[in-house]
Amino acid sequence: MAHRQDIQFISEGLKCKGWFFKAPCSEKAPCVILAHGFCGVKELRLSAYAEAFVEAGYHALVFDYRHFGDSEGEPRLLLDIKKQHQDWRAAIRFAKGLPGVDSHRIALWGTSFSGGHVLQIAATDQDPDIVAVISQAPHMNGFATAAASGPVQSIRLGIAAWRDLANMLMGRSPYYVHSCGFPGDLAAMTAPGVVEAVKKLYPPGFEPDERVAARIFLSVGLYSPGRFAKRLGIPWLVQVAARDLTTPVKPAIKAAGKAPKGELIIYECGHFDVYVSPHFQQTVGDQIRFLKRCL
């Protein structure tokens, strides 16, 4: 098992906490930076990816966003896209300064919602030290994601969002909804099998708080990072789950085709299948082969 150490860095005055997995090499090595998707925390199998990257000769930095997991931030479980972008940039700065890291060979790894984050950050910041991006089952188009929920569910989530916003304006605690639920539940993801699939990501004895402040649903439909694909000039691996019922696949396929150096791989599985065996071995293997060509 790879050596793992607890780390923390500052993002906009608050501590983001995470893990650093150090590659067993004497010379400086590239670093892959990873963070989870919608409401996800690092314990949900990000260490499995990090350990695979370390075995391939790369350092790996995994972190929780502010307001989630072990990181600071009040209120808890507040998903703010701008803040998460700030956290990514803070993580990149921090990783560049870690002992043993080749600061000019940084790769970004995002999954689901963060698969869009890493595209937009790399495309807009144009940081020459970021040399590769991986987006796994990524969110690319907000309108498509909202439409996939159906009109009734979209209205229900919109009402919840306005209720949460009203709470904020009155100084009250957030109005929360669950990130995943059964069909018909008031939750962000309610496709058949989602609840069971997410639980497969839990390590033994770990029970995360799977709620989110509902105000995020006023923003999701407007968040379309796929529009930045044509501006991304570095290698970008896009991995799509063909039977994804949570994140629409067509926008990801379209975005990959627009990127000058986009590479698309489609897997015959569902959204959450990519995290676990047998599809995990296939997807992470493709990621490592991609990194070996780029780093």
Stretches with model-predicted labels:
Residues 267-295:
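Catalytic active-site module of serine/aspartate enzymes centered on a nucleophile-bearing elbow/loop
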Residues 1-27, 81, 276:
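N-terminal cap/lid segment of alpha/beta-hydrolase-fold proteins
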Residues 41-45, 68-103, 276-283:
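Catalytic nucleophile-loop/oxyanion-hole region of alpha/beta-hydrolase
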Residues 119-202:
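Alpha/beta-hydrolase-fold enzymes
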